[in-house]
Amino acid sequence: MLCQYVFGVVYIELGDVATVTKLAGFEFTKYVTYSDEGQIIALRGLNVKNGKLDLKDVKYIDKSDLSKLTRSKLHIGDMLFTYVGTIGQVALVNENDRFYLAPNVALIRIGQPFLKPEYMRYYFQSSMFWNTQINRLLQSSSMQNIPMEKIRKFVLPVPSTEVQERIVSILDRFDTLCNDLTSGLPAEMEARTKQYEYYRDKLLTFQQK
């Protein structure tokens, strides 16, 4: 990625640097019966919220079914993207051997060392991404979901890995600070959240190509 150091930021289609896929519904219905208890979690759309995994309401998969779901196994650094229903929610997988992909959630698995999953997660939450990719796509059609081929066409601004890491470090600190205020006054929490969103969008807004 020498051009990153010459021009600062390069624009790349997601499908050129990541595997984007989903699990067909029949792959689950054929092999899996959900359970309300267990160890292996099937991550559904409702578990992907505000950049994080929300594990308040989960369904489990029996370990005896796992050998039939090799395409569904998730790894650290995998990013989930909701493409139907509440479109555009993202989260990163933070553990191995615990999570499997359920239907109606897209898996984005980055295949290049110059693109950091943590940077991707923050960028997918930014106003720049929503204004240039999601909103434009939804406004141009009556689709209630985003097909995989459209997701693969998402255009990403990719700065150097050093810049990506700096952005992630700053936003991680803001995120931690906001979480520390969850028991504070509502007005204070709202103000801090707006401040976080402002700096996130400033850091993740690049000159259009």
Give residue spans per PLM region:
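A short beta-sheet element
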Residues: 44, 69-72, 76-126
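Sequence-specific dsDNA recognition surfaces
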Residues: 17-31, 46-76
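Short, structured motif recognition centered on aromatic/hydrophobic residues
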Residues: 9, 14, 40, 74, ...
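A short glycine-rich beta-alpha junction/loop motif
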Residues: 99-106, 139-160
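Non-catalytic DNA-recognition/assembly elements of restriction-modification systems
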Residues: 3-25, 188, 194, 199
